[in-house]
Amino acid sequence: MKIKQVQSIIDQNAPLISNLANLSRVLMDLVEGTFWCGFYLVDEENNLYLGPYQGSLACTHIKYGHGVCGKSLELKKSLIVPDVHKFPGHIACSSLSNSEIVVPIIKDNKVIGVIDLDSTKFDNYTEDDKAFLEEVANIIANL
């Protein structure tokens, strides 16, 4: 059901950035306990830069392999972090964040960006959230 809501707001004729802007709002509403939801996009140096998001101010640049987002980019895999304070090298963009999930957006075997969600609750994100967000990432990769 949630994936149908995502599909319903995708505009195949709109630029990627426009779709990501709307998706950041929808995902914030659909994934319970989320206080920050956004996208980081990969630049030509294989680092991440801030894309559309909902929530408080965010880090604008994340280096490859750094923090949860950079590690997801490096490993090309989704990461669920139940307690960000225990994650080696965590980048604290907000002191409110206690748990995080990051899902890479992979197109033609290359990560083009990541979906990043943060919660004030510890252990907020589940395997179901991961599966849902991986479906969303697949939709984005095919835009």
Label every model-predicted segment.
Residues 1-53, 143:
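Intrinsically disordered, low-complexity terminal regulatory regions
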Residues 7-9, 119-143:
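Juxtadomain coupling helices with adjacent low-complexity linkers
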Residues 99-106:
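A short, aliphatic-rich beta-strand micro-motif
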Residues 106-119:
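Sensory-domain boundary capping and coupling elements
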Residues 31, 92-97:
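Short loop/turn motifs at secondary-structure junctions and domain boundaries
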Residues 36, 102, 114:
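Short hydrophobic/aromatic beta-strand element in the GNAT-like acyltransferase core
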Residues 42-92:
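Regulatory sensory and allosteric helical modules in signal-transduction proteins
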